[in-house]
UniProtKB/Swiss-Prot annotation:
Pathway: tRNA modification; N(7)-methylguanine-tRNA biosynthesis. It holds the Pfam family Methyltransf_4. S-adenosyl-L-methionine binds at residues 125, 150, 177. HAMAP family: tRNA_methyltr_TrmB (MF_01057). This is tRNA (guanine-N(7)-)-methyltransferase. Catalyzes the formation of N(7)-methylguanine at position 46 (m7G46) in tRNA. It catalyses: guanosine(46) in tRNA + S-adenosyl-L-methionine = N(7)-methylguanosine(46) in tRNA + S-adenosyl-L-homocysteine. One of its GO terms (molecular function) is tRNA (guanine(46)-N7)-methyltransferase activity. It comes from Helicobacter hepaticus (strain ATCC 51449 / 3B1). The lineage of its organism: Bacteria, Pseudomonadati, Campylobacterota, Epsilonproteobacteria, Campylobacterales. CDD domains: AdoMet_MTases (cd02440). Keywords: Methyltransferase, S-adenosyl-L-methionine, Transferase, tRNA processing. It is an enzyme of class 2 (transferase). The keyword S-adenosyl-L-methionine applies. The gene is trmB.
């Protein structure tokens, strides 16, 4: 993650604009003055930088707030370079010249919001890694939109560069949680969902991508005879996935061991060199619901706020605050303040696929509230958590 260290960090008066970047305000944490957030805007991007004093190391750090980071990484690095130039006592940094892929702003990199009304026939790969298989899918299926979802930033930047070099126009890339994507996609639009060499998490099953809910959403999103394809070198993971598959209705299965695929991924080549077994589980959806409408659960796309009372923030000292329900939770981690602007750090939604967001509330001529960057993804759990948050902020 781009950052710099200094014995003391000095910031110019805000707001100020330089090189197309606007540094809007610095909001200090209410119960810890050593922590603050700096809101930055650049073109259509909006993100926070976090300034923190590290007492145990006797220095200060300025870095991007992870939950608001944007792509490409070069946008964040350039913002940090601007502020780094104001410092007289920089200890170290990793803000050297951007690589081409760190500067690439691709129209094929999309947010989750883009897919709320997406209805084109598609192929989906979850955790594409080096991208070899995903690029092959896109090249071999020019009449399908291919969607790759990944959480590893260097892998995302690498494949976006390849998309540009190869001139592909049928491939979208997302940085996010695949389980959330599946919940918001329309029904029966995918011909294939590919999960190749996922992390097994044999001691932390709750972190696995394969779960009963994952199967439910995958089969809903798959078209008739669409395939969910797991490829793994871990026999325990394979057996557990097979057990889950056998609990589903209206499917057919194919199982292969050490079958050669057209494309060999970087990890697969490593496992084969170590003479490890490779397991394939192909699950075909053989029943199509006659209801072709969009998944009607996800109808709320806007997160509105009623009248927020300032006293509820000024008097609210119960941090962190947690609300845990049967199928959702809300965690108010902290409160930041910059004059008439308050920022709530939030984590909420489903226990196994939480969303982290910052809520900005401004008390000027009119009260306004919005989530920084973009709204949460409207999963059922996120909607319930949002409604509870409204109760906290508006109660008399």
């Amino acid at each position: 993650m781009p950052h710099f260290l200094a014995s003391h960090i000095t910031l110019p008066p805000m707001p100020f604009t330089q090189e197309g970047y606007t540094f809007v305000y610095e909001a200090k944490q209410c119960n810890d003055s050593s922590q603050s957030l700096i809101l930055v805007r650049y073109e259509d991007n909006e993100f926070f930088l976090r300034k923190a004093w590290r007492g145990n190391k006797n220095n200060a750090i300025l870095k991007c707030e992870k939950s608001t980071k944007t792509q490409p990484t070069g946008i964040i690095k350039n913002a940090l370079k601007i502020l780094c130039a104001y410092q007289k006592n920089v200890i170290s940094h990793n803000l050297n010249k951007n690589t081409p892929r760190q500067n690439l702003q691709s129209p094929y990199f999309q947010s989750m919001d883009f897919f709320l009304d997406f209805a084109k026939p598609c192929l989906i790969e979850i955790g594409f890694g080096s991208g070899r298989h995903l690029l092959h899918l896109a090249q071999s299926n020019p009449h399908f939109m291919c969607i790759g979802i990944e959480i590893h930033t260097p892998s995302i930047e690498q494949i976006l560069r390849q998309v540009q070099l190869l001139g592909l126009e049928n491939l979208y890339i997302i940085n996010g949680d695949a389980r959330i994507l599946l919940e918001i996609l329309s029904s029966h639009i995918a011909q294939g969902i590919y999960v190749h060499f996922p992390v097994p998490w044999n001691k932390k099953h709750h972190r696995r991508i394969f779960s009963p809910k994952f199967f439910q959403e995958s089969l809903r999103v798959l078209d008739n005879n669409g395939v969910l394809h797991l490829r793994s070198d871990d026999e325990i993971y394979f057996q557990d996935a097979l057990s889950l598959a056998l609990q589903q209705e209206s499917i057919s299965l194919e199982i292969h061991k050490n079958q050669q695929e057209v494309i060999t991924s970087k990890y697969e080549a490593r496992w084969k060199k170590q003479q490890k077994n490779i397991y394939d589980l192909k699950i075909f959806h053989t029943y199509k619901n006659t209801n072709n409408e969009k998944n009607v659960k996800n109808t709320q796309k806007n997160f509105y706020f009623d009248k927020i009372l300032r006293k509820n923030l000024d008097n609210y000292k119960n941090f962190p605050h947690k609300k845990i329900a049967n199928d959702w939770f809300l965690h108010i981690d902290n409160l930041y303040c910059a004059g008439d602007i308050y920022v709530l750090a939030l984590c909420f939604g489903d226990f196994n696929q939480p969303q982290s967001k910052f809520l900005q509330i401004e008390f000027c001529n009119n009260v306004s509230a919005r989530y920084i960057g973009s709204n949460p993804i409207p999963t059922q759990a996120a909607i319930k958590a949002h409604k509870y948050l409204i109760q906290i902020l508006t109660q008399e």
